[in-house]
Amino acid sequence: STLHNTLFPYTTLFRSHFEVAKKCIEKAKHCLIEKPITATHEEAVSLIEMAEKNEVIVQVGHVERFNPALAVLKNYKVGPLFVEAHRLSQFSPRATDVSVIHDLMIHDIDIILWFVKSPVKKIDANGVDVLTETTDIANARITFENGAVANVTASRLSASPMRKMRIFQPDAYISIDFGKQFVEVYRILEPGEDPLDNSVPATMLGSIEKGNKNKEIYYEKPPVPELNAILEEQRAFIKAIMEGGPVPVGADEAAEALRIVEIIDKQINS
């Protein structure tokens, strides 16, 4: 089939992503590459140039983008001014050759960049290696050109797992639990303003005065569909190949997430 002739499934360590993907792209094979896209940002840029030259599709496996908890937010206006993210896991010998920044934190960095849509202005990072020879616990404060700030924490030495993100903006507070797959939204609306713009039942919690205006506080817990994120990711990749459309997580976005990861890693280990 056309699809069979244009893509090639493979599994390899992230440090060899570039070499394997390079060979596939040179043979005009579309690639779905696990995150991080490559071992270095320099390799990612080179891969993007090759993909454009050979007119092939490259999608990167930032699978959290397909988490159904994140999908429900398409019905909301998300414009963060402050983001707090925690991604914690219990220790496992798996992937100890790569830092927690590359393995876990990169998920939240990708999502935050996708939400904020502004260039990064400043990064302050700290971390420590406890059980391995790479960073096991890391924290980064990322300041964006538009004034937004993100505080991101990742650990692979936690007693219990956690994958949560909290988003604060002038008119709303949004809490996302990627692990348990639920979303809670608190919104401030003017009296008479319809809170049901996404057909989600809203509960009025009370009213406050803000900016010399009376505002109403609403709570919403939108239903999260039962979806398999990995399957949705693969479907999106196949759809892009068959229909020629863009992929949800392109190589450019993945390369930028990796660039930020490299800055954080360099700060911690310099």
Annotate each PLM feature:
Residues 109-188, 192, 224-227, 231-244:
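Contiguous beta-strand/loop segments that form the cofactor/metal-binding neighborhood of enzyme cores
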Residues 27-29, 54-57, 148:
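A short helix->loop->beta-strand "cap" motif at the edges of active sites that frequently abuts
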Residues 61-68, 91-122, 135-136, 253-254:
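Mid-domain beta-loop-alpha active-site segment that forms a flexible
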Residues 38-95:
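A contiguous active-site-proximal alpha/beta segment in oxidoreductase catalytic domains
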Residues 2-13:
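Short, small-residue-biased leader/transition segments that mark boundaries at the very start
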Residues 9, 222-224, 232-270:
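C-terminal helix-rich "cap/oligomerization" subdomain common to oxidoreductases
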Residues 16-34:
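Rossmann-fold NAD(P) dinucleotide-binding segment
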